[in-house]
Amino acid sequence: MADLIPLAQARCVPRKGSDHKLGEARLAELLPQVPGWELSEGGQALLRTFRFKNYYATMAFVNALAWIAHHEDHHPDLGVHYDRAVVRFSTHDVGGLSENDFICAAKTSALTEQLP
């Protein structure tokens, strides 16, 4: 289970079916582990806006995030702008949020500590 190790070090696993959809209690446990992220769409998605100095920094972040998404086989919806990127995670195969969304949110947040 992802909470035995830090979320940013966990790996995504395939999750299909509503039995993998997180309930309110588990969401309340995991949300504090991804500071800056918020529940959206009635708890069906995780959302965060990342701000950057310029377009180059924004694109560096987006490209690094694309590598993580490919590696974890879990892909966010992105809104890319000059000085910000809006990142939204949800697991369509479970009809809401799964632990994979929190794992990828933590990995995404960790990127900002490594980029210029």
From Swiss-Prot:
Coiled coil: none annotated. It catalyses: (4aS,6R)-4a-hydroxy-L-erythro-5,6,7,8-tetrahydrobiopterin = (6R)-L-erythro-6,7-dihydrobiopterin + H2O. This is Putative pterin-4-alpha-carbinolamine dehydratase. GO terms for molecular function: 4-alpha-hydroxytetrahydrobiopterin dehydratase activity. CDD domains: PCD_DCoH_subfamily_a. It holds the Pfam family Pterin_4a. Gene3D superfamilies: Transcriptional coactivator/pterin dehydratase. It comes from Stenotrophomonas maltophilia (strain R551-3). InterPro entries: PCD_sf, Pterin_deHydtase. The keyword Lipid metabolism does not apply. NCBIfam families: PRK00823.1-4 (NF002019). The keyword Hydrolase does not apply. Belongs to the pterin-4-alpha-carbinolamine dehydratase family. Keywords: Lyase. Its EC number is 4.2.1.96. One of its GO terms (biological process) is tetrahydrobiopterin biosynthetic process.
